Amino acid sequence: MSSQEASKMLRTYNIAWWGNNYYDVNELGHISVCPDPDVPEARVDLAQLVKTREAQGQRLPALFCFPQILQHRLRSINAAFKRARESYGYNGDYFLVYPIKVNQHRRVIESLIHSGEPLGLEAGSKAELMAVLAHAGMTRSVIVCNGYKDREYIRLALIGEKMGHKVYLVIEKMSEIAIVLDEAERLNVVPRLGVRARLASQGSGKWQSSGGEKSKFGLAATQVLQLVETLREAGRLDSLQLLHFHLGSQMANIRDIATGVRESARFYVELHKLGVNIQCFDVGGGLGVDYEGTRSQSDCSVNYGLNEYANNIIWAIGDACEENGLPHPTVITESGRAVTAHHTVLVSNIIGVERNEYTVPTAPAEDAPRALQSMWETWQEMHEPGTRRSLREWLHDSQMDLHDIHIGYSSGTFSLQERAWAEQLYLSMCHEVQKQLDPQNRAHRPIIDELQERMADKMYVNFSLFQSMPDAWGIDQLFPVLPLEGLDQVPERRAVLLDITCDSDGAIDHYIDGDGIATTMPMPEYDPENPPMLGFFMVGAYQEILGNMHNLFGDTEAVDVFVFPDGSVEVELSDEGDTVADMLQYVQLDPKTLLTQFRDQVKKTDLDAELQQQFLEEFEAGLYGYTYLEDE
């Protein structure tokens, strides 16, 4: 593939921007993966890797996970903050604290811990805290405890502190402080406390409600003062060491981040005036990733990079400290999405294609109903030279005639053959109009979008949107989706992707299309009998954890892929995926009982013994098979 063709494909799918140097198109027109852009020779052809795995028994859909990307993301964020601190003469330290709620899988936690980079861990529940405490011995032992807490949660955190870890119990509501002080006295340990301040500043977009004055978490200004006085009276003011705030997840606009950090810096200054020696400044999450590749303020993009993010935070905190003669605190960010999103690709196969194939019908009979005659007249006019009617007018006329025919069909005026004739002619008209539209003409864009959606291929993909990409369904989040091969061809077709659940919501509604978002996906020409595999990218944050069991489709298989500079690749199975039996047990249906009940029914039939045994074996094999569609 020429460099010009490769450049065009990169622009079509915006790979150069959302791919972040981890994903690219190689000379074969295949997606390639480079888990560490600092080692460009270590890369793998993803399409070929999947085919090799399939030949070895790999089932699809499957998650292809690249732990080396996780480690590179952590190094990149740490490096950005190091540069910012050096640039602005910031004397405080920096810590990335990974909030495990983003992805609690062992491969993620342990890959980050073993990266050799400074790292803390954050927990938001008792279960998460237990996972964090068990792994804390492998890190520099910074633990941040967020979320609502009961006595057991608080005791666990204090036990971690007593074991020698730095465990910050962040006070989210005033009722927690009495329990903390009580349990600290019982355990004879000095608690290390934080306070989450509820800011007036708020981001925008799909996750804005997680920040601002209406946020679910945090203390208002009056409550912060109350907490300070409570601790002063208890002689524990020195325990309050961390200031925490959260603007929202996936912050698209750097200006919103800068505004929020400036407001929170005032809390830091005012708390010092009250005698509180805040040592850590936890800015929470918000560091976004560019799912669209548009470098914009849209909900699924960001208009900044790692360096600008780090510079804004370090400058704002440092400036407030210099202005008020205060020490530079240790800066903490809880950048889970930015660490994990890129490292996972869902790969699946297309199990069926429905194309809008058409043939131009012959002229209707002379005594055919008027609506059919009208459609034919419009079709003929479209091919007459010098016609003055617009493309839009032709399209509208044919749509009105087709609408009348559909209504007439319901009332018995038109036959099935006449309806089919009209629909074929309408598709022919749409195709003819499409050929004459100019994408550079702004007036044509709405018609182009309408026809692309009408004429798009329907691709039925072997996956559950609700299990593997729940945010695409729940909050209409966009994820990059494209074929793993055939990218050396011009994307002349359009497609929409549908999952295999029995739910009309199981469809992807938005796709990357150059610098914009479209309701159909650009597709290279392909063999409908052997369509390409598809990759759903940047699904490493939240999707595995939020996925639900709609239609009892379970977790997919997952493999960890390691790529080395000599071209070698190691693949480890990290999750075998759920069986049908696993999913049935989730809903209290015992597989053995079901098998017994089915066996009893089979025995009551008049089928011969051999056929009965065959049916029983098939039923049992299905129980312990994959929940997704499998090749025969």
Swiss-Prot record:
Keywords: Decarboxylase, Lyase, Magnesium, Metal-binding, Polyamine biosynthesis, Putrescine biosynthesis, Pyridoxal phosphate, Spermidine biosynthesis. Its EC number is 4.1.1.19. It comes from the Bacteria. Gene3D superfamilies: 1.10.287.3440, 1.20.58.930, Alanine racemase, Lyase, Ornithine Decarboxylase, Chain A, domain 1. Its cofactor is Mg(2+); pyridoxal 5'-phosphate. GO terms for molecular function: arginine decarboxylase activity; metal ion binding. Catalyzes the biosynthesis of agmatine from arginine. HAMAP family: SpeA. This is Biosynthetic arginine decarboxylase.
